[in-house]
Amino acid sequence: MMRPVSSNNVAFCASGKSSCLSQDPMRGVDQFGLYPTQQSKFSHTVTHKNISCQTQEAINETHLQTSTSRDLDTKSDLKKKKNVGRSGKRGRPSGTTKSAGYRTSTGRPLGTTKAAGFKTSPGRPLGTTKAAGYKVSPGRPPGKKQQALMCSSDA
Protein backbone atom coordinates (compact mmCIF):
# COMPACT_ATOMS: atom_id res chain seq x y z
CA MET A 1 0.00 0.00 0.00
CA MET A 2 1.16 3.48 -0.70
CA ARG A 3 0.22 6.16 1.75
CA PRO A 4 1.31 9.75 1.47
CA VAL A 5 3.46 10.83 4.36
CA SER A 6 4.00 14.56 4.76
CA SER A 7 7.31 15.88 6.02
CA ASN A 8 8.35 19.50 5.51
CA ASN A 9 5.27 20.04 3.34
CA VAL A 10 6.60 17.68 0.64
CA ALA A 11 4.38 14.72 -0.15
CA PHE A 12 6.16 11.38 0.19
CA CYS A 13 4.82 7.88 -0.37
CA ALA A 14 5.41 5.09 2.03
CA SER A 15 7.31 3.21 -0.66
CA GLY A 16 10.04 5.83 -0.64
CA LYS A 17 9.18 7.69 -3.88
CA SER A 18 9.14 11.41 -3.83
CA SER A 19 5.49 11.74 -4.74
CA CYS A 20 2.38 9.71 -5.34
CA LEU A 21 0.57 9.66 -8.64
CA SER A 22 -2.57 11.09 -7.14
CA GLN A 23 -0.64 14.06 -5.71
CA ASP A 24 1.76 14.57 -8.61
CA PRO A 25 1.52 18.24 -9.70
CA MET A 26 2.90 17.40 -13.16
CA ARG A 27 0.28 14.87 -14.21
CA GLY A 28 -3.21 14.32 -12.91
CA VAL A 29 -5.16 11.14 -13.04
CA ASP A 30 -7.14 12.47 -15.99
CA GLN A 31 -3.99 13.05 -18.05
CA PHE A 32 -3.03 9.39 -18.43
CA GLY A 33 -5.10 9.03 -21.55
CA LEU A 34 -7.48 6.31 -20.46
CA TYR A 35 -10.77 6.60 -22.24
CA PRO A 36 -13.97 5.36 -20.63
CA THR A 37 -13.95 2.22 -22.82
CA GLN A 38 -10.41 1.41 -21.72
CA GLN A 39 -11.19 2.06 -18.08
CA SER A 40 -13.92 -0.56 -18.20
CA LYS A 41 -11.34 -3.09 -19.43
CA PHE A 42 -9.12 -2.61 -16.42
CA SER A 43 -11.74 -2.23 -13.72
CA HIS A 44 -13.55 -5.54 -13.46
CA THR A 45 -16.27 -6.07 -10.96
CA VAL A 46 -16.34 -9.56 -9.55
CA THR A 47 -19.80 -11.02 -9.27
CA HIS A 48 -20.47 -14.29 -7.53
CA LYS A 49 -23.32 -16.45 -8.65
CA ASN A 50 -25.40 -17.38 -5.67
CA ILE A 51 -27.05 -20.76 -5.89
CA SER A 52 -30.22 -20.84 -3.92
CA CYS A 53 -31.12 -23.73 -1.68
CA GLN A 54 -34.03 -24.68 -3.91
CA THR A 55 -31.81 -25.36 -6.90
CA GLN A 56 -29.39 -27.39 -4.80
CA GLU A 57 -32.27 -29.49 -3.46
CA ALA A 58 -33.56 -29.98 -6.99
CA ILE A 59 -30.11 -31.10 -8.09
CA ASN A 60 -29.89 -33.52 -5.16
CA GLU A 61 -33.36 -34.93 -5.90
CA THR A 62 -32.55 -35.57 -9.55
CA HIS A 63 -29.27 -37.19 -8.51
CA LEU A 64 -31.12 -39.47 -6.11
CA GLN A 65 -33.66 -40.41 -8.77
CA THR A 66 -30.97 -41.35 -11.27
CA SER A 67 -29.01 -43.35 -8.72
CA THR A 68 -32.06 -45.38 -7.67
CA SER A 69 -32.94 -46.16 -11.26
CA ARG A 70 -29.32 -47.18 -11.82
CA ASP A 71 -29.49 -49.49 -8.80
CA LEU A 72 -32.56 -51.20 -10.24
CA ASP A 73 -30.80 -51.65 -13.57
CA THR A 74 -27.72 -53.14 -11.95
CA LYS A 75 -29.84 -55.57 -9.90
CA SER A 76 -31.57 -56.85 -13.02
CA ASP A 77 -28.20 -57.02 -14.81
CA LEU A 78 -26.77 -59.08 -11.95
CA LYS A 79 -29.58 -61.60 -12.33
CA LYS A 80 -28.84 -61.85 -16.03
CA LYS A 81 -25.09 -62.11 -15.50
CA LYS A 82 -25.38 -64.78 -12.80
CA ASN A 83 -26.14 -67.52 -15.35
CA VAL A 84 -23.92 -66.24 -18.15
CA GLY A 85 -21.43 -69.12 -17.97
CA ARG A 86 -24.01 -71.93 -18.11
CA SER A 87 -26.28 -73.14 -20.84
CA GLY A 88 -29.08 -74.03 -18.41
CA LYS A 89 -29.79 -74.15 -14.71
CA ARG A 90 -27.95 -77.45 -14.21
CA GLY A 91 -26.33 -77.85 -17.61
CA ARG A 92 -22.67 -77.88 -18.48
CA PRO A 93 -20.75 -74.61 -18.72
CA SER A 94 -20.72 -73.00 -22.13
CA GLY A 95 -17.63 -73.73 -24.15
CA THR A 96 -17.29 -77.35 -23.01
CA THR A 97 -17.99 -80.40 -25.14
CA LYS A 98 -20.40 -83.24 -24.54
CA SER A 99 -17.52 -85.67 -24.23
CA ALA A 100 -16.40 -83.87 -21.08
CA GLY A 101 -19.05 -85.91 -19.25
CA TYR A 102 -21.36 -83.23 -17.90
CA ARG A 103 -24.84 -84.34 -17.02
CA THR A 104 -27.86 -83.24 -18.98
CA SER A 105 -30.29 -80.72 -17.58
CA THR A 106 -32.42 -83.56 -16.13
CA GLY A 107 -29.51 -84.82 -14.02
CA ARG A 108 -28.71 -88.07 -15.87
CA PRO A 109 -25.47 -88.80 -17.73
CA LEU A 110 -25.19 -88.03 -21.41
CA GLY A 111 -25.92 -90.93 -23.71
CA THR A 112 -28.62 -92.43 -21.50
CA THR A 113 -32.34 -92.34 -22.00
CA LYS A 114 -34.81 -90.92 -19.57
CA ALA A 115 -36.29 -94.39 -19.00
CA ALA A 116 -32.95 -95.76 -17.83
CA GLY A 117 -33.26 -93.66 -14.69
CA PHE A 118 -29.54 -93.12 -14.09
CA LYS A 119 -28.64 -90.67 -11.37
CA THR A 120 -24.95 -91.57 -11.19
CA SER A 121 -22.40 -92.81 -13.68
CA PRO A 122 -23.27 -96.26 -15.09
CA GLY A 123 -19.73 -97.61 -14.58
CA ARG A 124 -18.61 -97.43 -18.20
CA PRO A 125 -17.67 -94.60 -20.55
CA LEU A 126 -20.59 -92.38 -21.33
CA GLY A 127 -22.29 -93.00 -24.63
CA THR A 128 -21.55 -96.76 -24.65
CA THR A 129 -24.05 -99.56 -24.28
CA LYS A 130 -24.02 -102.60 -22.00
CA ALA A 131 -23.43 -104.82 -25.04
CA ALA A 132 -20.00 -103.26 -25.57
CA GLY A 133 -18.65 -105.54 -22.84
CA TYR A 134 -17.58 -103.01 -20.20
CA LYS A 135 -17.76 -104.00 -16.56
CA VAL A 136 -20.68 -102.53 -14.70
CA SER A 137 -20.46 -101.00 -11.25
CA PRO A 138 -20.19 -104.21 -9.12
CA GLY A 139 -17.08 -105.23 -11.07
CA ARG A 140 -18.28 -108.14 -13.17
CA PRO A 141 -18.86 -108.29 -16.92
CA PRO A 142 -22.46 -107.96 -18.05
CA GLY A 143 -24.36 -111.24 -18.35
CA LYS A 144 -22.02 -113.15 -15.99
CA LYS A 145 -24.70 -113.44 -13.30
CA GLN A 146 -27.10 -115.24 -15.63
CA GLN A 147 -24.47 -117.81 -16.62
CA ALA A 148 -23.67 -118.51 -12.98
CA LEU A 149 -27.33 -119.23 -12.28
CA MET A 150 -27.55 -121.63 -15.19
CA CYS A 151 -24.54 -123.55 -14.00
CA SER A 152 -25.93 -123.89 -10.52
CA SER A 153 -29.27 -125.14 -11.80
CA ASP A 154 -27.58 -127.80 -13.97
CA ALA A 155 -25.76 -129.21 -11.01
Swiss-Prot record:
This is UPF0461 protein C5orf24 homolog. The lineage of its organism: Eukaryota, Metazoa, Chordata, Craniata, Vertebrata. Belongs to the UPF0461 family. It comes from Xenopus laevis (African clawed frog). Residues 60-155 are annotated as: Disordered. Pfam families: DUF5568. Residues 60-69, 94-107 have a biased composition (Polar residues). Residues 78-92 have a biased composition (Basic residues).
